Amino acid sequence: MDHDFVALGHAGSEAYAGLETFPNPGVEVVEMVSDELTAVCPITNQPDFYTVTIEYRPRGLCLESKSVKIYLARFHDQGVFCEALAVQIRDEVAAALELDAAGVHVSLRQKARGGITITAST
C-alpha cells in the first residue's frame, strides 16, 4: 500500500492528524470496538468510562485504526454527556468517511456510576 499515514508508526498523540482513511479494499461492513474511551461529566467533572462500538458500511474509504485510537483519547478531559458524545463521534466519523450520518452507527455504553449504566446509540 502506498498510502502515507501520519499517526500509524508514530507513538504519541502529537502525531494526530485527524481520522485517517485508506481506500476500501472491498469489505462490506466494518465494526470497531474499544473500551478505552473516557470523558468527564460536564456537571460533576467525574470521569466516565465507555465501551464504544463504531459500525459503518464503507463506500470508498475505511478508517485507519491507530488514528481512531488517538481520536478517542482526545475526549479524556472533555466534559460531555454520553448521548451528545455518541452523536459527535458519529458525525465526525461520517465526515471522515465521506458518508451521510445515517451510514455510521455508534453505540456508547457508559460503565455504571451511581448504580446506572447508560447506553446511547445513533
Please report, for each region that a protein language model flagged, where it lies by residue.
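N-terminal intrinsically disordered, cationic/polar leader segments
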Residues: 1-122
